[in-house]
């Protein structure tokens, strides 16, 4: 099993009105909708999907693997695990599972 997010460009933005692909999208309480009320896509990050999976009872290590190594292997990408010869971007968590820092292409973001 893998975890995915169909997050759209409003992910991480404050509630408000946006235009994406020529469509007006209103984000309220982290829910994005078009003018006719249809969902415009998810505003959940993959990290939030992992946290949700854990809340539903999936072991934490399995949830992280479902969001990283498993999909990478299915797509034939050398990523998703810390191993020689693999691309490795990381999130470093605090004890309360909040993000402490992110490492992308060797660059540290705090």
Task: Indicate where each model-derived feature is located.
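Short, acidic, Ser/Thr-enriched surface-loop or helix-capping motifs
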Residues: 94, 103
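His/Asp/Glu-enriched, well-ordered alpha-helical/loop segment
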Residues: 1-86, 90-93
């Amino acid at each position: 099993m893998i975890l995915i997010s169909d997050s759209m460009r409003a992910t991480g933005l404050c509630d408000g009105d946006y235009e994406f692909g020529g469509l007006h999208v209103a984000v309220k309480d982290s829910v994005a909708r078009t003018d006719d009320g249809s969902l415009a896509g998810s505003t959940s990050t993959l990290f939030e999907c992992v946290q949700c999976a854990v809340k539903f009872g999936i072991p934490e290590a399995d949830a992280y693997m479902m969001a990283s190594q498993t999909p990478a292997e299915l797509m034939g990408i050398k990523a998703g695990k810390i191993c020689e010869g693999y691309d490795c971007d990381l999130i470093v968590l605090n004890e309360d599972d909040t993000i402490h820092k992110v490492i992308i292409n060797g660059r540290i973001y705090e």
